[in-house]
Amino acid sequence: MGQLIDGVWHDTWYDTKSTGGKFQRSVSAFRNWLTADGTPGPSGEGGFAAEKDRYHLYVSLACPWAHRTLILRKLKGLEPFISVSVVHPLMLENGWTFDDDFPAATGDTLYQHDFLYQLYLHADPHYSGRVTVPVLWDKKNHTIVSNESAEIIRMFNTAFDALGAKAGDYYPPELRNKIDELNSWIYDNVNNGVYKAGFATSQQAYDDAVENVFTALARLEQILGQHRYLTGNRLTEADIRLWTTLVRFDPVYVTHFKCDKHRISDYLNLYGFLRDIYQLPGIAETVNFEHIRNHYFRSHKTINPTGIISIGPWQDLDEPHGRDSRFAE
């Protein structure tokens, strides 16, 4: 854990003293857009046109934000277009590292850096801010396109369609208002909500955060009792964004982040939804529980100083879910 300040690495934990013990996530700094023809997107600069083998994705298999991008890459069939490097699951005094001595960690396959912060300095020698994954990298211009997962998945959704990406629109125009509304409260109360609970340093901050987590889960349980996915019977980015948190909830967040009022496996609809998406073609291979559990339990020394990995609980995600037949059109 740490950050760069004017190009110099500092090993620092999150500052919660000035916020009453509340965890506040910083805003992603690189917000350019990869588009079909290189025209500028909603933010940042233009010039990032979709091309085969021009872009590279840096991810952690532990990270729910990076996991979103791996799923869209899989669903859209972008493996031939976008290569990947996987960091080591442990994030300690030097942040994310490129050690390759853990199964499925690849090292930095482009520049052979030791640490992810060196890649950020490659793009901006005076960068100040957190060093996070995912990172969408432009191999042509040797710079970061984006480190905002919510925007990277939208780039992947459409940018390569004319070059042979798989069919499928996970942010369809007719559902965008509904998706945006879902994304907003799910991000605040579930995706980031578990971190607010886990990284809280006051009882009140924890109590407020964990109450919001389970209020939101109850709301989601109700929604998913009405149709197969969040917006109906069509898989969208809203489902993927929720799912990468749910798949980590019982193995990690219940114990490590003290989100232990209920497990996802206690909810009929949420647990079915979790298994449903896990069993979609290609999704299971994006999940690595060894990276997930080793990262959280062994990296966050502030909240788990011994680094002991808890025993569970575990789930059988291959168990039939029945949601396809239950909500058959």
Residue ranges of each PLM-predicted region?
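C-terminal alpha-helical interaction module
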Residues: 1-329
